[in-house]
From Swiss-Prot:
This is NADH-quinone oxidoreductase subunit H. It comes from Buchnera aphidicola subsp. Baizongia pistaciae (strain Bp). Its EC number is 7.1.1.-. Keywords: Cell membrane, Membrane, NAD, Quinone, Translocase, Transmembrane, Transmembrane helix, Ubiquinone. It comes from the Bacteria. The lineage of its organism: Bacteria, Pseudomonadati, Pseudomonadota, Gammaproteobacteria, Enterobacterales. Belongs to the complex I subunit 1 family. One of its GO terms (biological process) is aerobic respiration. One of its GO terms (cellular component) is plasma membrane. NCBIfam families: PRK06076.1-1 (NF004740), PRK06076.1-2 (NF004741). It is found in: Cell membrane.
Length: 322
């Protein structure tokens, strides 16, 4: 692990680089919410948000103003401290994962030797925010939504972790930079194709995105575990979902598509391009797929994703041994 540099110049550079990357992630997440609504509008033969600014470009600003000026209401029947902690935990848990993802060989906030394990740890921590939000709201719909989300996330995190192990075995390291370096000449998408499929599907479930958005299903649970949240607290949940999409897209680019590897252009250009492509795929999936029944979604995980990860691990072991 690389700790904070000692010299004052290096320390200032490190802090500045960290702030710039995290602010860029937050801005990207905000913009993505508007891009998603515009793309969904085009695919559904309607306009989408196009009134604030040119073609709706300032819709992000309008949304932020609306959230900040809404009443910051805490239900009288809720567990207040837990109710306040839950959205902060949801926002921070996956935002911290950004710190270990390298944009290039030289642009990484924290170069952790246990990078993959750190991601899995933060992903597990995000489950607590959902469970605490549903329980502390003291609302039956919020509680049902949080139970659904917890069961779903815990189940698919098993496949998420197993799908990472093939990549780790091939790189012989949990370090993200080592994983990218191991893909020079051959990206992991080819030898780890089954692992990629399982990771991508589990990533959708981790982000609670279509078709794995049962915890927030409006028709059944009235918006799920954050039904009692408003103002900035709801905004933290809202922006946290898009941060999780950025994190999963970045990890797919890093672990399976060579990260910053690419010809001609600067290394960070290729990383950003690959990440943006997967973020767009997340949006297109939301526009294309229906919401399956909850029990079918859970069965799909254990009957399809779990065997896929096992086949991938066996295949990887055979290649490494022989």
């Amino acid at each position: 692990m690389i700790f904070l540099p000692i010299s004052s110049i290096e320390t200032k550079t490190y802090i500045f680089q960290s702030i710039v990357i995290l602010v860029c992630v937050l801005i990207t997440a905000s913009i993505m919410s508007v891009v998603e609504r515009r793309v969904l509008g085009l695919l559904q033969n309607r306009y989408g948000p196009n009134r604030v600014g040119w073609q709706g470009t300032l819709q992000v600003v309008a949304d932020m103003i609306k959230l900040f000026f809404k009443e910051d209401w805490i239900p009288t029947f809720s567990k207040k401290i837990t109710f306040l902690i839950a959205p902060i935990l949801a926002f921070i848990s996956l935002l911290l994962v950004i710190t270990i993802i390298p944009l290039s060989p030289s642009i990484v906030i924290v170069n952790l030797d246990i990078g993959v394990l750190f991601f899995l740890m933060m992903a597990s921590l995000s489950v607590y925010s959902v469970l605490l939000a549903g329980w502390s709201s003291n609302n039956k719909y919020a509680l049902l939504g949080s139970i659904r989300a917890t069961a779903q996330t815990l189940s698919y995190e098993v496949f998420l972790g197993l799908s990472c192990m093939g990549v780790v075995a091939r790189a012989k390291s949990f370090n993200m930079i080592d994983i990218v370096d191991s893909q020079i000449g051959l990206w992991n998408i080819i030898p780890q194709f089954f692992g990629f499929l399982a990771f991508f599907i589990a990533g959708l479930a981790l982000c609670h995105r279509h078709p794995f958005d049962q915890p927030e299903s409006e028709q059944e649970l009235a918006d799920g575990y954050h039904i009692e949240y408003s103002s900035i607290k709801f905004g933290l949940f809202f922006i946290g979902e898009y941060i999780s999409i950025i994190v999963v897209s970045s990890l797919i680019s890093t672990m399976f598509f060579g990260g910053w590897l690419g010809p001609l252009f600067p290394s960070y250009f290729w990383f950003i391009l690959k990440t943006l492509c997967f973020m767009m795929i997340f949006i297109l999936i939301r526009a294309s797929l229906p919401r399956p029944r909850y029990d079918k979604m859970m069965l799909f995980g254990w009957k399809v994703c779990f065997p896929l990860t096992l086949i991938n691990l066996i295949f990887t072991a055979l290649i490494m041994l022989y």
